[in-house]
Amino acid sequence: MMLLRELLAPWFPYAGEQTFLDLTLDSRAIRRGDVFLALPGHKVDGRQFIDKALAQGATAVLVHTDNPQEQGKVIVAEQGVQIYFYELAKHVSAVAAVRYPVIQGHAMGIVGITGTNGKTSTSQLCAQLVTLLSGKAAVMGTLGNGLWGELVDSGNTTADAITLMRQLHEFANKGVNTCAMEVSSHGLVQGRVDAVPFDVAVFTNLTRDHLDYHGDMENYAAAKQMLFRFDSLRHGLLNLDDPIGGAWLAELKNVPAKIWGFSIEAHKAAAFYTKNVRFNDQGVQATLVWPEGEIDISSPLLGAFNLSNLLAALSALYLQGMDMRALAAKVPYLVPVAGRMERFTTADNITLVVDYAHTPDAIEQALNALRRHCAGVLWCVFGCGGDRDKGKRPLMGQAAEQFADRIMVTSDNARSEDPNQIITDIIQGLTHPERALTEVDRVAAIKQVVAQAKSGDVILLAGKGHETYQEAAGVRHDYDERALARQLSEQS
């Protein structure tokens, strides 16, 4: 419990003596004794639900106002109190941090990871490594939030500001040593992480995605860069193999954090890098170099991009104070992240690889990685999401056609759009559309490719990854591509 006046004290005085339990942005989730934050939203205005919130037992409602003269205005009603808060939408994270404090410098360090691709893998690798060293790790991101191995589906890459601060507070109370958090561009722009005391930030890469929201690549990049300007930040890690990372190295010279570079291509400005890289059927071997020395590592993860993700995770944990040699010793015991370059092999020696790749760059990276492990034909089965950036559809087709031997274009969360039209949009990017296979039913498409494949072939199933649904006509249908791949591998 907390006094309402203590919650509001950083912004304005309040004389009431009410206590409350939790904060919430969802009027449907209110329990007696909670405080409801009524904000204007992207689709719905929460201020429409003030009466409902009070009727359900809310102690108080904090009401967003754009009028500075209304700051601290109080309306007392029989069911509860309404308190006006100037530009509350901009302060939700800070308000949540008062109720659910996470104190920087205590036992838990927070690693924030941003970038178009690699956020999930890097965060999961951080958590695995901490756990392998007998620490306690938590993850927040696409695969869910929670202690490592106990993730609960979150719905968004970056949770809302209140959920986020409440969970960080709980993690700290549970003795978590490291929380690895995926930080989306949406989460940064919308202020959901404003009060999070990040101590290490990681940038993985930047390629075309979410332009339906950000408008152009410049705005998208600026959103990502916000993470490296937090006052709490002690260290920033930039992928210097990405041109944006190199540019940011110069742009971020005057931020509070110390900025470091990492590279799997031995970039001359990188403090953390790999050399003597050797890929094989079992993964990759390399020499890891960091400011205090070098050591050989052997990773079971496929592809150069996973080596980059691993290097990012190792470097971030080292900057948090962990011993690099101890970390490197645990690398052979890492397991692939669910739905990220996850392999299933049939009795006929056909390899199906389930991956979340859903951008042109991710398709290219995944196919390039698999080419090293493919003795036969390299296939790519993919689609594009509906109600999203239409401009990337032909680019997805271009990437698949250029880096795979055979392609099958199918559905991938058409949402409210016609899946056949999305397939047509993708095919516009092909140089030789007559060579592409198309099948709107994703299961049928995959089965058709498996039936045509031969021993030594590799089939990339791109786009779904860990997801357990296929969304069409606004309805989410149960669909688990990992389970399908496992079933097909066991049937052969």
Curated annotation (Swiss-Prot):
The keyword Transmembrane does not apply. It comes from the Bacteria. The modification N6-carboxylysine is found at residue 224. UDP-N-acetyl-alpha-D-muramoyl-L-alanyl-D-glutamate binds at residues 25, 27, 42-44, 157-158, 184, 190, 192. The keyword Cell inner membrane does not apply. Its main location: cytoplasm. ATP binds at residues 115-121. It is an enzyme of class 6 (ligase). Its EC number is 6.3.2.-. GO terms for molecular function: acid-amino acid ligase activity; ATP binding; magnesium ion binding. GO terms for biological process: cell division; cell wall organization; peptidoglycan biosynthetic process; regulation of cell shape. Gene3D superfamilies: Mur ligase, C-terminal domain, Mur-like, catalytic domain, MurE/MurF, N-terminal domain. InterPro entries: Mur-like_cat_sf, Mur_ligase_C, Mur_ligase_C_dom_sf, Mur_ligase_cen, Mur_ligase_N, MurE/MurF_N, UDP-N-AcMur-Glu-dNH2Pim_ligase. Belongs to the MurCDEF family. MurE subfamily. This is UDP-N-acetylmuramyl-tripeptide synthetase. It comes from Shewanella oneidensis (strain ATCC 700550 / JCM 31522 / CIP 106686 / LMG 19005 / NCIMB 14063 / MR-1). The lineage of its organism: Bacteria, Pseudomonadati, Pseudomonadota, Gammaproteobacteria, Alteromonadales. The gene is murE.
